[in-house]
Every structure is written in structure tokens, then in C-alpha cells.
């Protein structure tokens, strides 16, 4: 919402962004661009040398009409994005360049608008919980690029609550994650005129559930997906919400939460990725 409002205000006619082949962010960007009559250019990096299969989010990107560039592993996607933007300008277009997740400033993004969206999400949830006479002790989410986690942290500070925001990393180490999240949170607070700043010490991230790496399915994640589906009828994905739920369950089993704590799990989407992992997921279910 906020990012595309900025793109419309800047009279952009093509949005350029990047992520992995099964990026939820890129798929949502393509959908929003289609709704607003803009073109979308997605720079999607392969994780390895496996064949590219049009399923999951990649299939939806095609259906949504995105122009897709598949990049080799290790490619600097930001540099490619700027090159593509220059090519679009030379053709008379007005490109809007936004990094993965939409919360790191740079390109066309002057403020961390993606994180602002999740600040608003925190305040919305806070109001809903208050109407039920509840206040969360913890809010648990998957974290990758960090914008969602940063936005929720600022939201908790803005609402002056004691809610602790817990990120379950789906990619990097906790140490590597905390400082960028704190930077995004501080930028978000500054952009909104909030007299507060954040350090790495204010960020809670657990990295024990990453497994072998980003997008690599493991048994605890598959178990969490199956349990939540069969107990609650809610679908989690293998990349983000499945790993985060596996982390939440393990933390609960280890006594991280008190028995009477109110714990909110934020489902960040990603369901289309299930179909990319179909056979692998079923093989874990059979074990």
C-alpha cells in the first residue's frame, strides 16, 4: 500500500525489484503493479544450478504478467536493477526501483515504507486484542530481510506496550540480522517523528531453526506445517511461516514462554510456495 502510493505519486510506470525464484515479495509486487496498470520487472536469483520450474510463486509471476529475468546465484541484484532502470529510462519510461522487502532505503525508496506497513499492522492487532481485553506478551514472526520485524518493533514502541517481538530467522545468523533490523527500525521511527532509536540489543532473533539455509526444507518445518494444517486447518509455507512455527513450538517446549503468556503468531503469507515443495514435503510427512 505505502510503497505503491509512493510509486504512483512519483508517476512511475514500471516497478523493478528482486528476490529469489519463489519470492513472495516479488509475486505481491507483480500483483500490485497489475492492479495499478504498471509493468513489473522481477530479477529472480537461482539458489543453485537446478532447472527452473514454473510453479509456485514463479508460475503466479508469469500469470500476473511480470517481466522475469532469471539471474545466476551470487549475482548482485541491486546493480542489475539499476542497469535495467537506466535501460527503461532510455526508452522513455519512469522506473521505480525498490529492494527486496521494501524496507531498505535506496533506489526510489526514500523512507522504509515496508516497515511502516507493519507498524500499522501492529497497531491494528493491538487494537483488536485490546477489544478482547488482551495484550500480547510476545509476537512471533519469521524474519528474512528484516522489514517486518523492524516495523513490529517500532509499532510496539509507539503503542507503549510491553509486547516482545520475536523473530525466527529463515536465512542468516542472529548476529547478522539484528543490526540491520535496528537500523530499519530507527529509520522508520525517524521518518514518523518518533523520538526513539533502536540498537541490536533491542532486537530478538533466534537462528537455531534456519537449518541448512534459506528455502531448504527440514523435518521440524515439515512437522510444524503438518501439525498446524491438521489441528487448525491453517496452511503454513516451507520457507517462512513453517520455519517460524517450528521455532515457536520448540521455544514453547523449552519453557521460553510462561504458561499464561499471550503469544501471537503472525502469518506472513507465502502459501503458493507449498506447491514448489510438494514432493519434498510429502517425503518428510512419510518419515
Specify the residue positions occupied by each region the protein language model found.
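Short glycine/serine/threonine-rich phosphate/pyrophosphate-binding segments
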Residues: 1, 22-29, 35, 145-152, ...
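Small/polar-residue-rich loop-to-helix segments that shape phosphate-bearing ligand pockets
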Residues: 45-132, 196, 201-224
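Glycine-rich phosphate/pyrophosphate-binding loop at beta-loop-alpha junctions
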Residues: 115-204, 266-287
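Active-site-adjacent helical/loop segments in soluble small-molecule enzymes
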Residues: 199-259
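Buried hydrophobic packing segments
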Residues: 3-7, 29-30, 121-125, 152-156, ...
Amino acid at each position: 500500500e505505502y510503497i505503491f502510493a509512493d510509486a504512483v505519486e512519483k508517476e512511475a510506470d514500471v516497478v523493478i525489484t528482486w528476490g529469489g525464484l519463489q519470492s513472495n515479495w516479488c509475486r505481491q509486487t507483480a500483483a500490485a503493479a497489475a492492479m495499478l496498470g504498471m509493468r513489473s520487472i522481477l530479477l529472480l536469483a537461482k539458489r543453485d544450478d537446478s532447472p527452473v520450474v514454473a510453479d509456485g510463486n514463479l508460475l503466479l509471476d508469469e500469470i500476473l504478467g511480470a517481466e522475469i529475468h532469471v539471474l545466476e546465484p551470487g549475482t548482485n541484484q541491486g546493480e542489475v536493477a539499476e542497469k535495467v532502470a537506466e535501460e527503461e529510462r532510455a526508452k522513455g519510461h519512469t522506473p521505480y526501483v525498490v529492494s527486496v522487502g521494501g524496507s531498505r532505503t535506496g533506489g526510489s525508496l526514500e523512507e522504509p515504507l515496508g516497515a511502516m506497513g507493519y507498524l500499522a499492522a501492529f497497531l491494528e492487532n493491538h487494537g483488536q486484542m485490546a477489544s478482547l481485553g488482551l495484550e500480547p506478551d510476545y509476537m512471533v514472526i519469521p524474519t528474512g530481510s528484516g522489514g517486518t520485524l523492524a516495523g513490529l518493533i517500532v509499532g510496539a514502541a509507539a503503542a507503549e506496550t510491553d509486547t516482545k517481538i520475536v523473530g525466527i530467522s529463515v536465512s542468516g545468523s542472529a548476529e547478522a540480522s539484528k543490526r540491520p533490523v535496528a537500523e530499519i527500525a530507527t529509520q522508520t521511527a525517524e521518518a514518523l517523528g518518533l523520538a526513539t532509536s533502536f540498537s541490536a540489543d533491542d532486537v530478538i532473533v533466534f537462528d537455531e531453526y534456519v537449518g541448512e539455509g534459506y528455502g531448504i526444507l527440514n523435518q521440524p518445518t515439515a512437522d510444524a506445517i503438518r501439525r498446524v494444517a491438521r489441528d487448525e486447518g491453517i496452511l503454513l509455507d516451507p520457507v517462512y511461516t513453517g520455519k517460524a512455527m517450528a521455532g515457536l513450538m520448540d521455544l514453547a517446549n523449552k519453557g521460553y514462554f510462561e504458561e499464561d503468556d499471550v503469544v501471537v503468531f503472525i502469518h506472513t503469507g507465502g502459501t503458493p510456495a507449498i506447491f514448489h515443495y510438494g514432493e519434498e514435503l510429502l517425503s518428510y510427512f512419510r518419515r
